Amino acid sequence: MNTRKWKFKQSRSIKVQVTNSKGKFMGKIIKELNNQNIKLNITAVYNAKQTEKILKILNKKIKVIISIFAGRAGDTGKDPVPEFSKSIKLAKRFKNVEILWASVREPYNYLQAKQLGCHIITIPPSIIEKIKKFGKSFDQLTQETVNVFLIDSKKSNFKI
């Protein structure tokens, strides 16, 4: 990487993958940008080992976001919560580091992230709409479901 200083507005950040397409840790680039006091969003992170490698090379001055892909991890049948828990504990030593819950798949992920003390969670609009339903009782859900069944049965024009 060219070691010249980048002219960069402090209100912006650069997104850098944790590894390149060959699986090599991008530590050299992360460290160089971080040492130039450029805010970073380090992305495509999946586990606490990757978080630890990142933290070992950071200065404690400039803001860094570590984006852990919870939904994609869950898609493999693995629970992302233990990795988040470990990563958040590791990051507590750094006031400038925030952990981001990326790749939200379901509304419950919001509660998981909140319970763990995750700093940031990116939530798509479709999930936000579902979060608005939080607090409904199972009885309310039963009645809503039965009403949908009734509407569907009327649309089918079946006679019983």
Predicted regions and their residues:
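Acidic (Asp/Glu)-rich catalytic clusters
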Residues: M1-K9, L55-I62
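Catalytic alpha/beta core domains of metabolic enzymes, predominantly
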Residues: K24, I30-E129, G135-L150
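Flexible, glycine/charged-enriched surface loops at secondary-structure junctions
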Residues: V97, K159-I160
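Short amphipathic alpha-helical segments with coiled-coil-like heptad repeat character
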Residues: V18, I121-T122, N157-F158
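A charged N-terminal "starter" segment
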Residues: N2-Q10, Q143-T145, I151-K159
